[in-house]
Amino acid sequence: FSSMKFIIFTNLEDTPIDECMVIPDNVLCISAVNAVEHGGKVIPAPYGVQRRMSPSDDRIDHLQKAMRNIPNATKLLYVNHNDNSHKEREGLKDMFRDWATVQDNRIDYQTFLADLADHKFVLCPRGNAIDCHRNWEVLYMRRVPVMKTNPYLMDLFYDYPVLWVNDYADVTEDLLELNNHLYEEAQEMDLSPLTLPIFFDKIINKYAGANG
């Protein structure tokens, strides 16, 4: 297939792309999730929300329904994650119990979305991979992810209202109140670039168009 040109899209992969990958000349672009080593032909792609895992998996339906009627948030910070997905998550919940909403128990997806909607900010530590579904669920619900600074993530989320911190210990009520403008921006942000047809078309037009 050396005479054919390719644009490659990857998704649902936690293994990061590193500098060891060899890209053939006829590959115009690789749009990849968790592309920690990106640049040149390799561009970061959103990890997005979880795909349907079975015919009865209705989480996407619940998310789309929740997105159509998002109430005003009444609380400041929501903390709900699996403590065992990555060492960065260990002990985080205990840091915020005194003033944030901390969920220790597993809850159904509808309750989770309702909880997201009731908070302006959501703590989003990395999971098994550097990017995770939680980050994008929070944005789709027009809330603000609180994320640890990372060059890859900061490139990926450049156009979106994210509160970046060097350490989660830096997250305080005062810091969140000072960054309330991010919550206001989230109410107005354009989510259309995160729909698959628009995302695909943008990449194809940019890279295929530039190469005839």
Give names to the regions the model predicted.
Residues F1-L163, D174-A210:
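Nucleotide-sugar donor-binding catalytic core of glycosyltransferases
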